[in-house]
Amino acid sequence: MNRREFVSGMAALGSAVVLDGIPGAQTPPPSVDFSLPRKADFAIPAGETYINSAYVHPMPNAGREALRRYVESRTSPVLDTHYDREHVKAEFAALINAKPSEISYVPNTSTGENLVVNGLRIVGTDANVVTDALHFDGALLHLGELKRRSGLDVRIVMPRDWRIDLKDLERVIDRKTRLVEISHVAMTNGFQHDLKAVCDLAHSRGAYVYADIIQAAGNTPIDVRASGVDFAACSTFKWLMGDFGLGFLYVKEELLDRVLRQTQYGYYQAAAMQTHFLPGDEPGAAPYSWKLSPDATGRFEVGTSGSGAQHVLEETLPYIRKIGVEKIHAHRQPLLKRLREEMPRLGFASITPPESTSAITSFTMKDRANVVERLKKANVNVRVAEDFLRVSPSVFNDMGDIEKLLEALS
């Protein structure tokens, strides 16, 4: 499919039908071919092999064009702010089987996590939080500071064989556990929690579950209803193919009023706002009156969010859903299998559980400087940490990219 066919397919969004019964969530017509891999949809320079989407995912061409149009509108004397911010939320909601009313914008994943922990009013009580060492390091810093500053009881389960055993979680979750906080897919090695099993365990002991889904949303099927997860958050610059400064927070509808306390306030939470001091205003006891929106927006959004990123997501979220998350998930499995077979033969031992199907696979590494030099010479981009190497293929990668990586390390 050429670029014109792609753009035409995306332009058809305006006339598409509602998908999955969720208002505002639409999909292009089924005649558009979205087979994988999709190299032509991305402007990755010729000769460069990028297998590092768990770090930052490249924008597809349609997203880049949307951002260009937005930037042009910002330089115009007549500002065009035309975009449907609620439609973008509906698209994300459909991606994880949530209701749009359960979704709010946040600047990033960490803000979402802070809103949940603060809203549950855990600090200053005898309650505890359970997490694990494969959770996002920024979240572990957050919980560690709460422990240091306020004495919060934080219980961290350590991995065994590079996975978190549900039985180890079971040993530390008790009736005083207020929150179980995990990454659905671990950023370090791609370990995947069985989200439903974790939720069933936590709920059986009266605890809630927060999941960081940044390394899963857009590449791994997520069903918040089926899993029972209470809260989830992610930024959009990774597998949602968006940009920095914008993310989503999911809060289960029945917990909005009953459990999660509102901890910040701002005008974006108002469903209606009325002045009472201007000419022609109705009289009032105060200069302003307002009604808060009853949904997640009315609880957690404070002010303006990243408009440029929202424009990008207007293109990328329908793009992801048209390809199909299940197809994205299936596409990478032969690539992961090849890596896990060949990398150990080259001296890179796997630290990803063999049953993992996530988009991340990692390997131990010696002589970092030599590895960096080899990859640089071959124009291959993967994450090289101090003592491990992480590979994360996406929709534009194929077996040729994997072979180029293997050749560079041979």
What are these regions (language model features)?
Residues 7-410:
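Pyridoxal 5′-phosphate
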